[in-house]
Amino acid sequence: MGDAWQRTKRITSAAFRPVRGRDLSLHAAAITFYGGIAVVPVALLAIWLTSLLVGGDRVRRLTSYAVETLPNAIGAPRAVDALVAAGVELTPLLALASLLPASLYGEGLRRAFVSVAASHTEESLVGWRGRLLLLPLLAPAPALLLSILIALPTTTRLVRQGGWIGALGVVLSFLAVWLVLTPVLMWVFRVVGPDSPDWLSTLALGSFTAANLSGFLHGFVLFASLPLDLGAPFGGFDEIGACVAVLLWLYLFHVIVLAGYSATLALSRWRASRA
């Protein structure tokens, strides 16, 4: 038991060596700032591209399953419904205008990753590199989003039944999000990040990080269903409380992403040293 514990400590210490001495919380907060600007434009572009591929009516029909199932405590169904409607009705000109704020997410990720990858601390044009390297992810966005939307009728129907059948629906939903996030994180870790870890390390840790993020996102849905008075700390303004809650969860989301990138770099460097 003692040897297993010591081995676990050594592995954990090695995984977080790239972020040792750096303020992980501050970098996660920085990504959250950029992400807060980019999250709506990214979602709009993904929905718009998907609607061009399969039609707006089908996108509305598939997303309606999620809208009907999401908890209403912080207004999530109304927000998702409005987001889908705006994305489906997006014009090419508005889509072009959304590209700039959407690309800011890549800048935030690249800047944070540069601070973790010590070999690139003097890199120039960090922001623009991150923006341009993130944009190719828009190409597979319709296929990735559609794979989740196609699973929604089945998973939401199972969740509504409750009990063990409902638990099966949650598991299937978890697996769908996990499979979609894995290639996204592989691209982010290997291409958007300044250091390019080897493919095996990227696949292993990218998939593991995606599994954690999938569970985390489902945890947010559970949180949104709790009867909490989010406006209490803000003078009764529920909208402000809901926004702060979303930003807090987005911040924790990026802590996991940074930790995953750090572990990927550590594994890749360890494998290179053994080669």
Name these PLM-found stretches.
Residues 1-275:
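Membrane-embedded alpha-helices and immediately adjacent juxtamembrane helical segments
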